[in-house]
Amino acid sequence: PPVHPVTGKKTYSAAPSRAPSQLSSAARQRNPIQDNNTHSQPSVAMAALARRAGGSPAAALWAAARGFASVGSDIVSAAPGVSLQKARSWDEGVATKFSTTPLKDIFHGKKVVIFGLPGAYTGVCSQSHVPSYKNNIDKLKAKGIDSVICVAVNDPYVLNGWAEKLQAKDAIEFYGDLDGSFHKSLDLEIDLSAALLGRRSHRWSAFVDDGKIKAFNVEKAPSDFKVSGAEVILDQI
């Protein structure tokens, strides 16, 4: 039977994906591979899309039709007007007048490793995903990474408490995507209502250089932890 989408232990029935015939003509025409170098090498682009979409050429074509953010995309342009909320205590939120951080301030002029996950205090996220980056922070910094960022569809106060519990705030910057707009823009939103989580994020990781996505990995299921950990991204930098 299907596994629980976050813990991998309980039965879970995933909501059906849209069939290609249900896509709008505009969506079918979008090409997620935007940088000239990748676009000029269709086999490389297709391989990247296949990895992004689950491995098969058919899945890769479907990914392209749906307009997934992918290698070569500009992550800031893909989510215009979107800001994230840095993890902090309530008092810090009040003191900063509940300020948010524009994506350009996070990515422009920097080498960033960012990973997204379904939510704070959930199983794989707490036991494997965050620790993989915390434990490899020195190796990431040695490769010239300016910041390692964890983002989830949570408020910044929950993320702050979780980060402190994991003793990960010194290594990783945590940001909330309060209304899910960042993940919606990248087509990384998933409905996890069956796990009482509502609409959340897929489990994913990316290496972003000055806003341009250089490597992009998305798990097939939120309970998986095979391609989005620090060990994988280290080999892609």
Pin down the residues of each PLM region.
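Chalcogenol-based redox active-site neighborhoods
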Residues: 39-237
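N-terminal chloroplast transit peptides
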Residues: 1, 5, 14-16, 20-23, ...
